[in-house]
Every structure is written in C-alpha cells, then in structure tokens.
C-alpha cells in the first residue's frame, strides 16, 4: 500500500454481537501487524439469554405511560417521527439526523425486513419513536426520540419495553447504540444510565489504526 501513497489503515471491526459465528481473526492480524486502538466507544446491549430486570425508575415510567393510555405500534409514518427526531436533536444537541426523512424512507423501502419504525402514540398521535435496524442476531436502535409530552409521561420507556419484551424477545441481542463522543473520551453518563435501566450492559466499539 505504500506504493499507492497510503500511509495509514483505519479499521472498525463489526462488534461481536452482530456476528453469527466467532470471527475475530482480523483483530489478531491487526495486533500481529502492530496496530493500536485509536478510539473506543461504549454501547449498551441486552443479552436476551441472560435478561436483567428493569430498574424501578424505568418500571415507574412504564406504569405512567400505561396509565396514560399510550399504545405502541409498528409504523410507516417516517415524516411525523422525523419531525420529532429533528426537533429533539436541534433543541438539545444542536445537530440533525444523519439521514433525511426521504433517505430513511428510501432505505426502508429497499430493506423493509431490516429497517423498521415503531412509535408510541397518544390519541393516535406519535409522541415517541425508534427506528430499528435488524440483523439475524441483533436489533439495533438506530434513532430514538420522544417529544416533550412523550418524555413527561414515559412513552419512550413503554415503547422500549414493548420492543424488548414482545417484538424482539426472539433476538439474541438488543443494542441501544453508543453513549460516547469524541472517540470515546466523553461519556454521557445520564444516557448510559437510562439504557442500563432496561438491563443493558457494555459492549465496546473499537477503532484500530495501523501505520503503513
């Protein structure tokens, strides 16, 4: 690769929870070649073979949503959910979704069995939602958001519980995604605590770097 002007190889292995069989051969090859870990993010994952009970706080939030009559459904209305998601990201983080609503709708149309939207609704109006990417082994929560109303009555907690206990109970893993920024040097402690309240525990997402 030196002949082509390449000076550095950056490799992000697929976390083991997405593999159907053990497949860490590339990691050993990188170690043997002298690669180093340049970044380490931390995700939160539920192992359905060793389910941990929900925390009391999460149970109270779910009970609040149940009392409010919140209902959970699979949905194809990406427009309404994207409005919620965009508002949340802009107001709380000053950012926007990686995908536009048109892009995510297109991806869903091409991979309808692997990309799905679930919403929590109050009087038939979505107030929380999760876009899930499915693999053979794992359900990955790619986008998660709730409106102010949804947050106040525990709609997102109810939706997450619905996905864990009913929709994806047959999957080996349910992955909430990472709670870190800046290559893993910043940990959002409130976010990871919320995920752990549903019984999730840590899985690292590493990045390897090899000088050529």
Feature annotation, model-predicted:
Residues 1-6, 166-167:
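Short, basic/hydrophobic alpha-helical segments
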Residues 3, 32-38, 198-203:
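Structural alpha-beta junctions
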Residues 6-14:
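Divalent metal-dependent hydrolysis catalytic cores, especially in the metallo-beta-lactamase
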Residues 11, 40, 75, 176-177, ...:
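Residue-level detector of family-conserved "landmark" positions at structurally sensitive sites
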Residues 13-150:
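A conserved beta-strand-loop-helix scaffold within acyl/acetyltransferase catalytic domains
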Residues 114-212:
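Aromatic (often tryptophan-rich) hydrophobic motifs at membrane interfaces
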């Amino acid at each position: 690769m030196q002949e082509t002007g390449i000076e550095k190889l950056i490799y992000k292995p697929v976390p083991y929870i997405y593999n159907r069989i053990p497949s860490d051969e590339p990691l050993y090859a990188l170690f043997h070649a002298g690669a180093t870990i340049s970044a380490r993010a931390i995700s939160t994952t539920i192992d359905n073979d060793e389910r941990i009970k929900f925390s009391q706080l999460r149970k109270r939030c779910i009970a609040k949503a149940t009392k409010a009559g919140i209902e959970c459904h699979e949905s194809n209305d990406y427009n309404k959910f994207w409005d919620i998601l965009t508002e949340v990201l802009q107001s709380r983080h000053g950012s926007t979704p990686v995908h536009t609503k048109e892009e995510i709708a297109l991806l869903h149309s091409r991979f309808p069995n692997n990309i799905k939207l679930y919403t929590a609704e109050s009087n038939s109006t979505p107030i929380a939602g999760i876009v899930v990417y499915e693999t053979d082994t794992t359900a990955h929560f790619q986008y998660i958001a709730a409106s102010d109303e949804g947050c106040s009555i525990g709609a997102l907690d109810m939706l997450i519980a619905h996905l864990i206990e009913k929709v994806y109970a047959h999957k080996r893993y349910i992955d909430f995604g990472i709670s870190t920024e800046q290559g893993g040097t910043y940990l959002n402690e409130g976010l990871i605590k919320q995920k752990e309240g549903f019984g999730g525990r840590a899985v690292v997402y590493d990045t390897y770097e090899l000088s050529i």
